Amino acid sequence: MKNTILILFTAFIALLGFFGMIAEPLADPLADPLPDADPDADPETVIVKAIATLSKKLLR
């Protein structure tokens, strides 16, 4: 019982952190990104590009 409560509490805290990270850009949508930011340095962009490339290869 104690382990179950600990697991649920940990999952709840993780979800709060996840949704908090999502809410940051929504709080200030007009904020400028860093001027010298490299879009390829963003891990999500790299993953999306890799998925797009793989899907193009598979669909040919």
Curated annotation (Swiss-Prot):
**Biological processes annotated in GO:** defense response to bacterium; defense response to fungus; innate immune response; killing of cells of another organism
Tissue-level expression reads: Expressed by the venom gland.
Question: Does the keyword field hold Repeat?
Answer: yes
Q: Where are the AXPX repeats?
A: 27-30, 31-34, 37-40, 41-44
Give the pro-peptide residues.
Answer: 28-45
Main localisation: secreted
UniProt entry tagged with the keyword Secreted: yes
Q: Where in the cell is it found?
A: Secreted
Q: Which domain of life is it from?
A: Eukaryota
Q: Which UniProt keywords apply?
A: Antibiotic, Antimicrobial, Fungicide, Immunity, Innate immunity, Repeat, Secreted, Signal
Q: Which residue positions does the secretion signal occupy?
A: 1-27
Q: Which GO terms describe its cellular component?
A: extracellular region
Described by its record, this protein's role is as follows: The synthetic peptide shows weak antimicrobial activities against a few Gram-positive bacteria (only 2 on the 11 strains tested) and the fungus C.albicans. Does not show activity against all the Gram-negative bacteria tested. Exhibits little hemolytic activity against washed human erythrocytes.
Instruction: Say which family it is in.
Output: Belongs to the MCD family. Mastoparan subfamily.
Task: Name it.
Answer: Mastoparan-VT5
